[in-house]
């Protein structure tokens, strides 16, 4: 079996199968200026079948991004504003009595959609957060005695405002670990902001067109898992994750007292999956070290627990990941 020929064939196949990525990107660029990192991560989440936790101040096109993506693939979109008085039933649905039928009927909640924007997830109590996170994990919801499967594709993008912390309920570490990525989004640059301004003044506001069907995304996910991961790349992934747990073994002794707990095995799996999806988006049939480095921060930043000492010295998980990537030998 000639591996070289196999990889060449796989590469050609991926190039064919991933052509829709350009169509989606083109459509989304009509309505969203800048925010390339966020849009790319949304696509990775969609293709790797994982959910995204987004951190950024209000007004950075988070709602518009996921709504536009849903429209381009003809999927159902639902926005849930999390508030302190929200109940799990407001999210999942409930049994209501129908006088006409003289029986209880199911009224499904907003979680029954392909794309969910869970806005300011840290504003709702733990009971509501865990109801959403359970739906994310199980891909099904139980109302009364009946269990209902959620539609595929199913992507949750939860947002957190990094500034307002009053009246918030921080997500527990175990819950945060369920997110494939935590993406931190920044302000647009000056040129992008001018374009946003012009776009709002222009009366001919552009809208996205539907260029794909949900089933095509489901099919693409199977292809993403076929993207080739060499053993050297697997070793590179495990070394990066293990360095968050045992920094001293990787010449990172200075972080021994800074890290309270390292990334879980889920991080290893997700690092591989996101790298495969990233390679797919770049129209490549194999993963290279640069793919791992490109997604490492998003996959690991919410999975490293810092000690009080790290916080006192203003050491962030980003600093630790940067140091790990600079220290671990690239294959």
Segments (PLM) and residue ranges:
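A short beta-strand-to-loop transition that corresponds to the Sensor-1 phosphate-sensing loop
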Residues: 120, 154, 158-163, 185-188, ...
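Conserved C-terminal "switch" segment of AAA+ ATPases
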Residues: 13-18, 31, 168, 182-255, ...
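Walker A/P-loop
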Residues: 46-83
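Conserved AAA+/SF3 P-loop NTPase catalytic/coupling segment centered on the Walker-B
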Residues: 89, 110-137, 151, 166-175, ...
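Conserved alpha-helical scaffold flanking the Walker A/P-loop in AAA+ ATPase domains
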Residues: 41-44, 97-117
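Pre-Walker A (pre-P-loop) alpha-helix and adjacent loop at the N terminus of AAA/AAA+ ATPase modules
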Residues: 14-60, 242
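AAA+/SF3 P-loop NTPase mechanochemical coupling elements
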Residues: 105-114, 143-160, 171-180
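C-terminal engagement/docking regions of AAA+ P-loop ATPases
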Residues: 1-9, 14-15, 247-331
